[in-house]
Amino acid sequence: MTWFIDRRLNGKNKSMVNRQRFLRRYKAQIKQSISEAMNKRSVTDVDSGESVSIPTEDISEPMFHQGRGGLRHRVHPGNDHFVQNDRIERPQGGGGGSGSGQGQASQDGEGQDEFVFQISKDEYLDLLFEDLALPNLKQNQQRQLTEYKTHRAGYTANGVPANISVVRSLQNSLARRTAMTAGKRRELHALEENLAIISNSEPAQLLEEERLRKEIAELRAKIERVPFIDTFDLRYKNYEKRPDPSSQAVMFCLMDVSGSMDQSTKDMAKRFYILLYLFLSRTYKNVEVVYIRHHTQAKEVDEHEFFYSQETGGTIVSSALKLMDEVVKERYNPAQWNIYAAQASDGDNWADDSPLCHEILAKKLLPVVRYYSYIEITRRAHQTLWREYEHLQSTFDNFAMQHIRDQDDIYPVFRELFHKQNATAKD
């Protein structure tokens, strides 16, 4: 029976190469479409695929055609509706729109539909997070305690009996005995053939036959003296410890839920948190999320309560920072976890509490986190909390802050916080 093995890299997806070429060629238009679609999508399906539309004129290619003007002679088919010099009415609905949309009729030229195609989840996320990096990753790794894990590393000639490899030792024994006795066995085989010939010959050659029997006995004795197993044959399983960088991260989501934070502001904060979570998930194998909501008191809650609880009150931001410090000390050792934090607020805070927030971040949190981002979602002027955080931004490289006014600012602000230039500034 004949077997055909398909070793093509693309398998049945024969057009994958053309698809990848298309994505590379029109990357700018696709990223623009994704950026616009990002602000329209539900927060629950941010990691699914996307239908991307590109204006037809953006993907048009140059082509050769006859120039306008000149004298041409053409022959057209006849008809039974029009005669020479008749005026042809314009079709109903016009053709100057941008395709088959719901726009009004136009009398200016002809329009074309936009080119629409579907991209997969992986393609969507690749384009969404392209040119982004985790800031200060290399600097923090240098002071991180590296864990070591034991891995198999072949075989060694020395070791403890518990690690002996029986199969490999017997293989070495067979190879050694074969190499040491191969010549003697060939010589023994030749002597046995000569003995058989002499034994059947006439007249009998008793002296020669006795000599051959004596040599055969000596060779067999030499072969038997080769030991079946020798210390030279023994092989032991070898193990070595290799550094195993931490592949787990924790993301702290801190949000103000005071009376000034309405549901639309919370939704904008949620979109930012989901972008950060997806971004971390593409870098670390295991990402845990800790939700801390606060007004005058801070509380660790689940995701649903974090975004949709109706509990409100005044605003004391330091309560959330204190709770985060307690959780880090209790559950997330900075030597084993990559700690990230994102804080969302409308900027309102008790005036006397803002300096305390500065002190907690500077002395307790920023020295142990990889990156701390603060987004202020408001259309009003900045208050004391923003001004205190500005001092932190000028002092700590792993602290960043941005201002969000409406939904369209979320994705650009996220890219600004995690652009690769920020990550490589000190490399």
From Swiss-Prot:
Disulfide bonds: none annotated. Signal peptide: none annotated. InterPro entries: UPF0229. Residues 92-102 have a biased composition (Gly residues). Residues 79-110 are annotated as: Disordered. Residues 79-90 have a biased composition (Basic and acidic residues). HAMAP family: UPF0229. Belongs to the UPF0229 family. This is UPF0229 protein YeaH. It comes from Shigella boydii serotype 18 (strain CDC 3083-94 / BS512). The lineage of its organism: Bacteria, Pseudomonadati, Pseudomonadota, Gammaproteobacteria, Enterobacterales. The gene is yeaH.
